[in-house]
Amino acid sequence: MGGDGPDRRQGEGQLRHHGQAEIEAPRVLEAARALAAGGLVLLPTETVYGLGADASNPAAVAAIFEAKGRPRFNPLIAHVHDVETAARIAAFDDRALALAAAFWPGPLTIVAPIRDPAAVCDLARAGLDTVAIRVPGHPLSRAVLAAFGGAVVAPSANRSGRPSPTTFADAVAETGDKAAVALDGGPCAVGLESTVVAVLDGPVRLLRPGAVTRAQLEAVVGPLAPADDDAKRSPGRLALHYAPDAPVRIDADAPRAGEAFLAFGAWPDGQGVFNLSPTGDLAEAAANLFAFLRAADRTQPAGIAVAPIPDEGLGEAINDRLRRAAGFVG
């Protein structure tokens, strides 16, 4: 078992998560058993909280779609414990293996031809001949995956179209009543969904920007091609997605009357102001984005204005989520 899994040196029945609170090993086993029985599990990852189910069980996968109100043409990402398991499920070429070596465990999803259709059922793949798969970087989720042994589909634990939950409280508020087991792994370190790339015939295509940036990917596989027709192979591509109840206005220099404001960089504190990063740090802004959208929405504003975010590095992923929250992507 890898170093991110259970630490047997810590004493019987305990796991340590990110150096924070100790997590009881029986809870990990309880989650694995719930998955094996066809139940849903609220699961932390480094990106966002997920609502997980056995990827091979069509009834369990259908329960996720029902819990989220998610369109069934939208494929789900399969999560596995290690690259060896991923390579048994998906057909990886040298480029996919290089990406896995560079970025796993971590926030990168690879779309590749399906090798073992029984491991990730047709419903989870939206009837496609490909599978979206990743090895998450959160020790608690990897411990559950190792105990379960198979693939777990785990879309964000929110109602479809809403901002993804990056705290346990927000995840429980969204879909906690649907889960047989709910695991608290603390705030999500990354705060944005994984980057998604398609590694099929032709050049590697960027289907969804995320925490692994374009520059980091191109350092491994060379120039990336646009998504084109392969966009349907990735989740998170709906025109209106990640949206709070209040309308979102992006690239705003200042809030209008009645609007909450998501600032970036130097901006005075004030009522209804939520600063994604006072220092202009894109990683901090990404980690805060969904939580601050939710916090702003709870003030019941006339709208939520968002300051301009540099469209470079991690900013590409932040702006993708903001454009979809505002309904500007078709």
Q: Over which residues does each language-model region extend?
A:
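Active-site-adjacent structural elements in enzyme catalytic cores
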Residues: G13-G330
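Extreme N-terminal basic, low-complexity initiation segments
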Residues: G2-L15
